[in-house]
């Protein structure tokens, strides 16, 4: 059973709800890709959006299980773009029992002369700070909130702009880098996450970045929706296709 909390005139009311479908989907991804192991110290990348908030909620529930034994905490990288949602985020994480640390940076000041702010630059700077923090504080894994749609959209963007087949791996380890990136939401799509966030009562208290509306990802999302008709089963087929490559019948 999980607790669901909603904001009502500045107060938080909690109720108990059954384990949602989203958590079962995350469990499958975690199991399939061996994302959580005994002794892990996992840093949750808490952007404040519905995806990473749902991910933190999952980890809060997962920590209550007996096995595997691991530790998890969250880091929010606050930027000069704005973090007006932060007070609510802190309260929600505290209620779940997830320690949340906030680090403030200026992504605008880091832009080179003549360059414009975009999704890639902002996200790369936040991941850089996440990696530094993880190494400094003994975390061996960073949990990112990228979901199934993100992965497929990235594959489409790379195929149509770079002419290469590449996306976001569920687990990304490095030979010369001590921190592994994991994406527990890799099998969950946007509608599933939205339904969960609505059910848990935090869909309206999480953030959405305005720069996403002007990015190539918005176009890729539209293409993915047309290609799959928004059906989860077809998205999973595309995801599986990225793993089942028959080179004998390719150029």
Give the ranges of each region predicted by the language model.
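ATP-dependent adenylation/nucleotidyltransferase module used to activate substrates
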Residues: 5, 9-155, 161-164, 191-199
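Residue-level detector of flexible, active-site-proximal loop/helix-junction positions
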Residues: 79-81, 107-109, 172-175, 188, ...
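Short, solvent-exposed polar/charged micro-motifs at secondary-structure junctions
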Residues: 111-114, 216-218, 247-250
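Catalytic subdomain that performs nucleotidyl-dependent activation
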Residues: 149-226
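Conserved anion/nucleotide-ligand pocket segment
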Residues: 227, 231
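A short, charged, Gly/Pro-tolerant segment at domain boundaries
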Residues: 233-251
């Amino acid at each position: 059973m999980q607790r669901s909390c909603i904001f009502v005139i500045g107060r938080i009311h909690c109720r108990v709800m059954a384990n949602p479908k989203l958590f079962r989907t995350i469990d499958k991804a975690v199991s399939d890709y061996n994302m959580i192991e005994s002794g892990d110290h996992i840093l949750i990348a808490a952007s404040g959006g519905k995806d990473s908030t749902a991910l933190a909620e999952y980890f809060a529930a997962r920590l209550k299980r007996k096995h595997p034994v691991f530790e998890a905490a969250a880091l929010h990288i606050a930027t000069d773009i704005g973090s007006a949602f932060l007070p609510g985020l802190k309260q929600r994480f505290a209620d779940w029992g997830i320690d949340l640390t906030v680090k403030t940076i200026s992504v605008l000041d880091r832009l080179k002369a003549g360059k414009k702010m975009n999704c890639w630059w902002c996200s790369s700077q936040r991941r850089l700070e996440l990696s530094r923090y993880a190494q400094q504080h003994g975390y061996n894994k960073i949990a990112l909130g990228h979901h199934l749609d993100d992965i497929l959209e990235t594959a489409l963007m790379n195929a149509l702009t770079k002419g290469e087949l590449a996306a976001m791996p569920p687990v990304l380890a490095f030979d010369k880098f001590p921190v592994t990136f994991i994406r527990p939401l890799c099998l969950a799509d946007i509608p599933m996450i939205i339904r969960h966030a609505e059910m848990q009562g935090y869909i309206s208290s999480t953030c959405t970045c305005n720069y996403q509306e002007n990015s190539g990802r918005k176009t890729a999302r539209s293409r993915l929706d047309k290609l799959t008709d928004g059906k989860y089963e077809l998205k999973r087929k595309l995801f599986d296709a990225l793993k089942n490559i028959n080179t004998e019948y390719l150029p």
